[in-house]
Amino acid sequence: MQKSEGFRSKTRYKLQKHPRQKGMAPLTRALKCYTEGDRVHVVLDPSVQKGMPHPKFHGKTGVIVAQRGRSFLVRVKDGGKYKDIIARPQHLRESKL
């Protein structure tokens, strides 16, 4: 049988929660607002499928470029190029630096 290459393939451990973090995230995380120029980390929340960027961007740091509806446009460096990804606030964490 041919191997499946879906959107969430090879993410067995990447999209896994620890037992104490299981369930839905706090509502304030979904209502978080960012402004242009904010530095954010892309940390995927597997309990929310909407607005989830591709798993290869998990753990990357980027800059907010614009807001698109409820989502944000984040510029992330991937190899030697900059790529713009669209992600909801549930999958973003504010950078402390």
From Swiss-Prot:
GO terms for cellular component: ribonucleoprotein complex; ribosome. The keyword Transport does not apply. Residues 9-21 have a biased composition (Basic residues). PROSITE patterns: RIBOSOMAL_L21E. One of its GO terms (biological process) is translation. This is Large ribosomal subunit protein eL21. It comes from Methanococcus maripaludis (strain C5 / ATCC BAA-1333). Residues 1-26 are annotated as: Disordered. Keywords: Ribonucleoprotein, Ribosomal protein. Pfam families: Ribosomal_L21e. Belongs to the eukaryotic ribosomal protein eL21 family. The keyword Ribonucleoprotein applies. GO terms for molecular function: structural constituent of ribosome.
